[in-house]
Design a protein with these regions (language model features):
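Charged, glycine-rich active-site and insertion segments that engage polyanionic ligands
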Residues: 1-50, 54, 60-80, 150-152, ...
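Short loop/turn elements that form and flank the Walker-type P-loop nucleotide-binding site
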Residues: 29-30, 82-87, 119-121, 148-151
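Flexible beta-alpha connector loops of hexameric P-loop NTPases
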Residues: 95-103, 130, 173-174
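Conserved amphipathic alpha-helical interaction elements at protein-protein interfaces in regulatory
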Residues: 57, 115, 146-147
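A short hydrophobic beta-strand->loop->alpha-helix junction that borders the nucleotide-binding pocket
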Residues: 37, 91-96
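Structural recognition of the conserved hydrophobic beta-strand(s) that form the central parallel beta-sheet
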Residues: 124-128, 141, 152-158
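Conserved alpha-helical scaffold flanking the Walker A/P-loop in AAA+ ATPase domains
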Residues: 19-25, 75-81, 100-124, 132, ...
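Residues immediately C-terminal
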Residues: 97, 132, 147, 162
């Protein structure tokens, strides 16, 4: 099982944030530069993809299912994202072999932004792990944020780490959070199981988000250790 945000058709316990963004979009007040801040593993990237899918699939045959906070897997925009070929979504993240988002990735982003759009839909730039941008990357990104292309939205995702005030000041910051009890309920839904049956409660108190808990469980599965033995 993968928790890759691109593949998550369900949005767990962040539907209140999605509703807020949807209302802003309907009123034509959705900020074009959004910063989602919060602990790693909350589902901020998943939230971003759900918002984008809602907007891009509005006039499609199988639009986003807003009442269920769920992506319809049959909609065209979702299928294009899964195949890595949606022209209206550009994703920037740390590459597997690197620790930082480097200047070449931002240059490639700028080059793609300078190309004409294939359709009249909005374009969305999702930059995950924004705190890993190096200075050169930040400076290049700032220039784009100061004069963004028309009909283009930037969604920057920060895992509650320090980012330069000059970058933060360009965006509207939305603080994302879940209490620990809700995080446990979310991971139970994801795994379709009660994790309290196989994980020590004291150990669980050190892992605060669904993503953190999930990867803890996966790590111990690989190591073939019993989580009940750890506290």
């Amino acid at each position: 099982m993968s928790l890759s945000p691109i593949n998550q058709t369900n949005l767990f316990s962040l539907d209140n944030y999605l509703s807020e963004f949807v209302e802003l979009y309907k009123k034509k007040r959705l900020p074009t530069k959004i910063l989602l801040s919060g602990d790693k593993g909350l589902g901020k990237s998943t939230l971003a993809f759900h918002l984008v899918n809602y907007i891009l699939s509005i006039n499609e045959e199988h639009p986003y299912i807003i009442k269920e906070s769920k992506i319809n897997p049959d909609n065209k925009s979702y299928k294009l994202v899964i195949n890595g070929s949606n022209p209206n979504i550009l994703l920037v993240d740390t590459l597997s072999e690197k620790k930082n988002i480097d200047i070449n990735q931002i240059r490639e982003l700028i080059n793609n932004l300078n190309k004409s759009s294939f359709n009249n839909k909005e374009r969305f730039i999702i930059i995950d792990n924004i705190e890993t941008l190096n200075i050169s990357s930040i400076n290049a990104l700032l220039k784009v944020l100061e004069e963004p292309p028309s009909n283009t939205y930037f969604i920057l995702i920060n895992n509650d780490r320090f980012i330069l005030p000059t970058l933060k000041s360009r965006c509207i910051n939305f603080k994302i959070s879940l209490d620990h009890k809700t995080s446990i309920l979310v991971i139970n839904k994801i795994l379709d199981s009660d994790i309290m049956k196989f994980i020590n409660k004291d150990l669980l108190n050190y892992y605060l988000t669904p993503g953190q808990i999930y990867y803890l469980i996966e790590f111990f599965k690989i190591q073939k250790h019993d989580l009940k033995d750890y506290d």
